């Protein structure tokens, strides 16, 4: 463990730091939510994380350490994949079938076996604070989406394939690395089935195109459309 931590601060570890530290900072912000707080506090924390992580990402410039020349048509494919994942994410809870919605939320949303109480959710703080809602939309689409792609597809999937991951041609990953990354990404989200589908799609994009840009585009499109869905339909449970 000490050796692993030491490598993050080594002079030659700039690529690892650039691809991982913004994500670690984002996750660290979750610790604050374990302390007693009111419904507005998580929205304020999210806004602060958005600003701080954006600054750190710009400072570390992770895009210098991943291929940025996707295959022909990769960006367009990323857009369509992003739209498809948004539909798969939102559709089960948008169908006019209460029984389907209840089953989905009870078993395919954390924690399985219980129904999430969105009526009392802190998410509705965004309906009272438009500025925080806009920051949430921008942060989820243009900050956390690139940060997650840099960490999961830019670093983790490659590091699990080969510890000297920087010498590994982008897109050449083992099945073990691919599926472990999908699993970790899935359980980072409350809607873990949607997270698994998204993780598979974004990972496949990165592997197929040999570039991280397509998966970033897909993730940005998904999160932006989901944010619009939340704001236009008052579906704050997604946030």
Which residue ranges define each predicted feature?
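Juxtamembrane loop-transmembrane helix junctions in multi-pass integral membrane proteins
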Residues: 10, 14, 37-40, 126-130, ...
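Alpha-helical transmembrane segments in multi-pass membrane proteins
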Residues: 15-82, 86
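Aromatic-anchored segments of alpha-helical transmembrane domains
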Residues: 26-34, 83-91, 182-189, 223-229
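Juxtamembrane helix-loop-helix connectors linking adjacent transmembrane helices
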Residues: 66-144, 161-172, 236
């Amino acid at each position: 463990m000490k050796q692993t931590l030491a490598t993050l601060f080594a002079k030659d570890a700039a690529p690892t730091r650039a691809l991982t530290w913004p994500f670690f900072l984002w996750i660290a912000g979750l610790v604050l939510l374990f302390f007693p707080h009111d419904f507005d506090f998580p929205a304020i924390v999210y806004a602060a994380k958005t600003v701080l992580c954006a600054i750190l990402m710009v400072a570390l410039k992770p895009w210098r350490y991943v291929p940025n020349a996707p295959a022909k048509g990769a960006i367009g494919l990323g857009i369509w994949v992003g739209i498809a994942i948004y539909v798969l994410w939102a559709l089960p809870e948008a169908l006019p079938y209460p029984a389907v919605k209840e089953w989905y939320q009870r078993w395919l949303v954390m924690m399985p076996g219980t129904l999430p109480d969105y009526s009392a959710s802190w998410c509705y703080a965004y309906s009272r604070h438009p500025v925080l809602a806009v920051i949430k939309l921008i942060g989820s689409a243009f900050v956390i989406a690139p940060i997650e792609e840099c960490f999961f597809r830019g670093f983790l999937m490659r590091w699990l394939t080969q510890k000297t991951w920087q010498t590994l041609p982008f897109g050449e990953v083992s099945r073990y690395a691919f599926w472990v990354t999908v699993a970790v990404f899935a359980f980072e989200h409350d809607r873990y089935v949607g997270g698994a589908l998204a993780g598979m799609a974004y990972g496949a994009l990165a592997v197929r195109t040999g570039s991280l840009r397509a998966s970033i585009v897909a993730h940005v499109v998904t999160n932006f459309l989901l944010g619009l869905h939340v704001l236009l339909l008052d579906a704050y449970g997604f946030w």
